[in-house]
Amino acid sequence: MGMFRVEYLLLGILVIGVRSRDIPNCDFFDTVQLRESEKLCNGSYRYEDVVIPAKLTGKYDYEIDYDGDRVSVPKHIRGCVCKLKTCIRFCCHHKKLMAGNLCSQDVYENLTYEYTLDITQLNGSVIKKHVLNDMVVQQDLPLPCERHYSLDAETSTYDMWSLYENGSLFRHFDQRYLSKQEFCLQPNPTSTGKNYSLIVAFNCIQKPSMKMAYGRFECVRKSRLSNASIPVKFSSVFFMVITIAAYLWLPKFRSLHGKCCNLYFICLAITFLLNVISLFGIFELKTPICYLTGYAGYFTVMATFLWLSVISFDVWRRFAMRKFQVFYKNKRSSFFNYNIIVWSSAGLLTCIIFLVDQFVETNLDNPYNPAVGVFSCWIFTNGWSATFYFYAPLAILIILNCASFFLTTRYIYVENKQNQKVLNNSEPQKLSRNHANYRIYFRLFIIMGGSWFLEIIAFICEMENMWKPLIILNDYINCSQGIIIFVATFCNHEMFRLIRKRIQNRNITSLELTNTSRPVESEKMADVELGK
């Protein structure tokens, strides 16, 4: 038995001894394969015109894929060549082209392109370097991600980028630095119709975390809590579906106010779903289905906040004008008018951004372009252009909602104060009434969209790069709107009483239909008279 254990111990030591040995203080993305390189007598390797000393080589049995995970591969030798000479990362062999999201099978020996690139040094100066003569081309690294899109600066100023001496890339449109793990370079046929190719950067189509807001906050994407927003948003949609179903099922919510609330919930749920589609890059950029998703998403966002304003106005009118009987006689026409106002206004705003996209050039220097479908299947919200088309309309509607909320709560407070003077209630009655008032104020605050006011503040903070905790807090509040609405409207004794009553009425109706197989003569006469 002891001999058996000794054999296993020796085997374990042997396995440890032959394990892969990474190069100390060398990132995997600064290495190249040396499988076909010449090995010198002193243990060094010659890679192109660079001699890599033995201490900068190591045995690897893995590669790092586009998700950052280690993937087991046959053991091979790698050298940390980027410590000796400036490296440039290509997606494939420098004589190949990208075919979709993969490298082409063919090597184009006659492929020619501009081999000189502008390289930004650490001190900020820009020098020109020849790709093949002045740098080491890394072309054996795994592709940086599953799906890519090219930054073609020749055709769009939105696609401007700068390459740095340390191998990182600066993307101009969102002012972001990308490591070599997040991009690669490759010749690409020019889209101007001329018969030559340019080196362009292929960067990743991100799969960002499932957060609400509208896919803009970098600090939320980088937050440790960002993954927690995925189940929160799914839960939010789930609870909104329950709330919508309850409003459709219960007769009480077939009133004017109930119909308006339900349309608000439906628009918000659709907005959530379309936003999810845009965040996950399900559709290819600049395709008809991508444009359709972006414009439909903008339409539902505007409709959501317009219905919220309608609800706020309707609640205020119910309290402030309830003495006027004419208000109660025109509910059907009011609902029709509300629909006309909401859908036509949302449609008009959507038409405006569509026309601007068609006739205004997409340019980073132009702050008036919505850029729907350019960077994601959504309106561009990472710059100040979002102020004109997105946050300005929302800010106006949110301010109107807050004003309606203030006027409504003030009216309730003043009226209750007058009632207390008239009734001269005892202390317990006053306390009970105060608790009831607080519940009313809270529900009004939720229904009238008071929490959305943080959305505008958070956008300004994001643009000015300040108060990041507030931005994250706002994003999670917005992400859980469906849960908040469910708690505020569904979780109360009145709602449970209505559900119980509805179920009991259905049971009684089904029992009566079962026991009465044929109508009696008096019921037939009644039916005839009703049919007259």
UniProtKB/Swiss-Prot annotation:
Family: Belongs to the G-protein coupled receptor 2 family. Mth subfamily.
Gene: mthl11
Residue intervals on the Cytoplasmic side: 251-262, 312-339, 408-439, 491-532
GO molecular function terms noted in the UniProt entry: G protein-coupled peptide receptor activity; G protein-coupled receptor activity
Organism from which the protein derives: Drosophila melanogaster (Fruit fly)
TM segment ranges: 230-250, 263-283, 291-311, 340-360, 387-407, 440-460, 470-490
Protein name (record): Probable G-protein coupled receptor Mth-like 11
One of the GO BP terms on file: cell surface receptor signaling pathway
Cellular location(s): Cell membrane
Extracellular side of membrane: 21-229, 284-290, 361-386, 461-469
